[in-house]
């Protein structure tokens, strides 16, 4: 960690004497720069191109050195549009990698890849900054204990639990509740773990980024009245940005998260939406730099790039970074090198189902498709493991029987199968839950359900003790006691109607 100005601040004026080059060639977002002999910048150094365009407007473009070409030339990738740049323009070597603001000042704000605020809320305190390129924590610093990261969301904690300091892949199409699930996790980590979150929008649609920001303000995750009370920092590198920005915005978000973990000793949630866009941007940059493409046209350095990002996301003795990454699967081909490389790093997968969303069951997490390496008796305990397996068996049997029910009806099933179907429908509804961040829309107060309560509830349903209760009593409640109370209310209401 260092206390210094950011690369986008007054540092440039102090460094003008230091190391000056000039632009020799521009091909889209890639620049070749000539420096005096013996004054070559290092790989990953930030360069700043300064000058004026044809209309006399000030131009300032930050680039990152990617290759040393020989003959005092370097090749750099621009972090913003290169419109208006011409050959011969002055280039200043800042002498250091890109550095971005970190710490409490970043909460509630939106940044670009350079760590500059883009939300029109004024400047950010840049006294504490950190370089975006760092090595992963050493083995001796790592916390190797396998611990569950309790989210307070029943379906996640029971069937596909997250690992503290782990990486989770979030799979789901448009409109199945990915954003609401993300916001609920941000809210719950702040309340239950006293932690903060960092959201990295990598190659997002600008509209989606704006929608997320507005929804966060509406739900209180970002506190407009007192910005320091906010629970999240946002870093966006949108679809319209050059590939250099999209390739590095994930590292900017990760750097902010690392500060909260290492210095503030907090549990941090890091969201990356979408990890595929990070790979895609790397592929574009690789082609622009003239590297020979590898399988399916991807960059030959795909595994290395992915590893350098993913290995920094981990638990140390100070705190943890738990990462939730939205994964786009091109043409639904799971063997594509981009998702295949991502899978190697994931500890759990949360799959959102359009079928469940259509039934009105939220969160629409598919209980049978979602997986976790943590769901082992040696880690979660025999009780949790047994309950989760029995819940999955019941739901699987219900799924198998659905075709028969559709053709012949429930009456043709055996007594045992009818009981299984009834319990499975209760389980399906009990896996739904009212969210704190959705209170504004649903009108029902959000519920955080501890792991012990979750296990107790599902054990009661499986044991048959609650067979007499109507299935709608289990819909959108917190713990099992609320379901029994709701059943009594439903009974009273039906009597009054009669």
From Swiss-Prot:
NCBIfam families: atpD. Produces ATP from ADP in the presence of a proton gradient across the membrane. The catalytic sites are hosted primarily by the beta subunits. It catalyses: ATP + H2O + 4 H(+)(in) = ADP + phosphate + 5 H(+)(out). GO terms for molecular function: ATP binding; ATP hydrolysis activity; proton-transporting ATP synthase activity, rotational mechanism. InterPro entries: AAA+_ATPase, ATP-synt_VA_C, ATP_synth_F1_bsu, ATPase_a/bsu_AS, ATPase_alpha/beta_chains, ATPase_F1/V1/A1_a/bsu_N, ATPase_F1/V1/A1_a/bsu_N_sf, ATPase_F1/V1/A1_a/bsu_nucl-bd. This is ATP synthase subunit beta, chloroplastic. Keywords: ATP synthesis, ATP-binding, CF(1), Chloroplast, Hydrogen ion transport, Ion transport, Membrane, Nucleotide-binding, Plastid, Thylakoid, Translocase, Transport.
């Amino acid at each position: 960690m260092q206390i210094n100005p950011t690369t986008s601040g007054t540092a440039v004026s102090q460094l003008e004497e230091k190391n000056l080059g000039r632009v020799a060639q521009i091909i889209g977002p890639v620049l070749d720069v000539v420096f005096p002999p013996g004054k070559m910048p290092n790989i990953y150094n930030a360069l700043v191109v300064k000058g004026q365009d044809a209309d006399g407007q000030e131009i300032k473009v930050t680039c990152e050195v990617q290759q040393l070409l020989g003959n005092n030339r370097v090749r750099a990738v621009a972090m913003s549009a290169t419109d208006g740049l011409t050959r011969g323009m002055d280039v200043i070597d800042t002498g250091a990698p890109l550095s971005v603001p970190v710490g409490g000042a970043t909460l509630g704000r939106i940044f670009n890849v350079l760590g500059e605020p883009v939300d029109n809320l004024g400047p950010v305190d840049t006294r504490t900054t950190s370089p975006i390129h760092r090595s992963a924590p050493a083995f001796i610093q790592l916390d190797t204990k396998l611990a569950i990261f309790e989210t307070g969301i029943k379906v996640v904690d029971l069937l596909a639990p997250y690992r503290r300091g782990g990486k989770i892949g979030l799979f789901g199409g448009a409109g199945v509740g990915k954003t609401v699930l993300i916001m609920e996790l941000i809210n719950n980590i702040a309340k239950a773990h006293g932690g903060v979150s960092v959201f990295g929008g990598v190659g997002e649609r600008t509209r989606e980024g704006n929608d997320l920001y507005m929804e966060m303000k509406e739900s209180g995750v970002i506190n407009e009245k007192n910005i320091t009370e906010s629970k999240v920092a946002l870093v966006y590198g949108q679809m319209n940005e050059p590939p250099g920005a999209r390739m590095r915005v994930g590292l900017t978000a990760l750097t902010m998260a690392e500060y909260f973990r290492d210095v503030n000793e907090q549990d941090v949630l890091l969201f990356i939406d979408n990890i595929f866009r990070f790979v895609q941007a790397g592929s574009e940059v690789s082609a622009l730099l003239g590297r020979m493409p590898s399988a399916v046209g991807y960059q030959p350095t795909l595994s290395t790039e992915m590893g350098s990002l993913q290995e920094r996301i981990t638990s140390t003795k100070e705190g943890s970074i738990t990462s939730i990454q939205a994964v786009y699967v091109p043409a639904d081909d799971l063997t594509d090198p981009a998702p295949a490389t991502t899978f190697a790093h994931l500890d759990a997968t949360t799959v959102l189902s359009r079928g469940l969303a259509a039934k009105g069951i939220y969160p629409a997490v598919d209980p049978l498709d979602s997986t976790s390496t943590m769901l082992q008796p040696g880690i979660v305990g025999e009780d949790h493991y047994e309950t989760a397996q029995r819940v999955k068996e019941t739901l699987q049997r219900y799924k198998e029987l659905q075709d028969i029910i559709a053709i012949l009806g429930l009456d043709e099933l055996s007594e045992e199968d009818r009981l299984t179907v009834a319990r499975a429908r209760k389980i399906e509804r009990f896996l739904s839950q009212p969210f704190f961040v959705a209170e504004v829309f649903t009108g029902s107060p959000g519920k955080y359900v501890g792991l012990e309560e979750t296990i107790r509830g599902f054990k009661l349903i499986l044991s048959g003790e609650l067979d007499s209760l109507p299935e709608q009593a289990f819909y959108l409640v917190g713990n099992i006691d609320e379901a029994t109370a709701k059943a009594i209310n439903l009974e009273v209401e039906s009597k009054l109607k009669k």
